[in-house]
């Protein structure tokens, strides 16, 4: 369920609120059978034109949901030993988009720059049980942030090249004294470089070649190559900004 309001101003200003029942990231788990709306989102977007060739949009958002986790905590390395109960997950961030095309016509050349920063906080009661020693339970608060920046440039009609970098911080824990000696401090900040080249033979199809240098796993570097064919069939919605 979502409600939005666009202000009657010379600039584009949109305010919105949304309620939902999330599944998966960024929430450990949510109960689909629970009453009410367990997840809430607030967002604001502001944008406008810069001359006849450029435009921009900036945004801010905040999201909150209740935790309902029955298995291991996903943010801990040895998750089989840990269970999180109760508490909330909160996520907020800032985003920015800049677009350029000669006289506003993107058919020949265009540039799109995009960036986003976000932070996630999880709190609740954590239980450590390795099956050998007595179980220990105490409050925990986890904080982690991440960001990405990317650019896509259309240098001739139908052909584009792009570059992207995304990164997560190693995060931090704030726990009770009972759990302090049982949790190892996170010491790795995953990141990834991506570059791509694509060709669009029509408005509804695209062929993309992409390479990733992926360091999202500690002590392991992955060199990944993808070849994609993307095709759209039938009616499609309005173009996004």
Question: What name fits each language-model region?
Answer:
Residues 94, 199, 221-241:
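Outer-membrane beta-barrel "beta-signal"
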Residues 3, 15-17, 44, 58-60, ...:
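Membrane-embedded beta-strand positions of outer-membrane beta-barrel proteins
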Residues 7, 19-23, 48, 62-68, ...:
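Transmembrane beta-strands of outer-membrane beta-barrel pores
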Residues 8-15, 49-58, 101-111, 158, ...:
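Short loop/turn motifs that connect adjacent beta-strands in outer-membrane beta-barrel proteins
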């Amino acid at each position: 369920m979502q409600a939005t309001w666009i202000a009657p101003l010379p600039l584009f200003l949109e305010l919105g609120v949304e309620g939902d029942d999330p599944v998966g990231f960024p929430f450990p788990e949510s109960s689909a059978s629970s009453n009410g709306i367990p997840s809430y989102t607030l967002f604001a977007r502001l944008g406008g034109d810069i001359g006849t060739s450029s435009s921009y949009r900036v945004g801010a958002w905040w999201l909150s949901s209740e935790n309902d986790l029955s298995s291991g905590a996903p943010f801990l390395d040895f998750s089989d030993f840990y269970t999180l109960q109760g508490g909330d997950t909160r996520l907020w961030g800032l985003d920015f988009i800049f677009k350029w095309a000669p006289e506003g016509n993107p058919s020949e050349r265009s540039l799109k720059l995009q960036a986003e920063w976000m932070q996630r906080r999880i709190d609740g009661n954590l239980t450590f049980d390795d099956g050998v020693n007595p179980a220990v339970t105490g409050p925990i608060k986890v904080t982690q942030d991440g960001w990405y920046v990317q650019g896509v440039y259309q240098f001739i009609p139908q052909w584009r090249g792009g570059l992207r970098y995304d990164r997560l911080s190693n995060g931090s824990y704030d726990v009770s004294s009972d759990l302090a000696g049982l949790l190892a401090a996170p010491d790795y900040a995953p990141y990834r470089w991506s570059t791509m080249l694509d060709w669009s033979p029509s408005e509804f199809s695209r062929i993309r070649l992409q390479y990733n240098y992926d360091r999202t796993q500690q002590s392991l570097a992955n060199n990944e190559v993808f070849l994609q064919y993307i095709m759209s069939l039938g009616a499609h919605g309005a173009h996004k900004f």
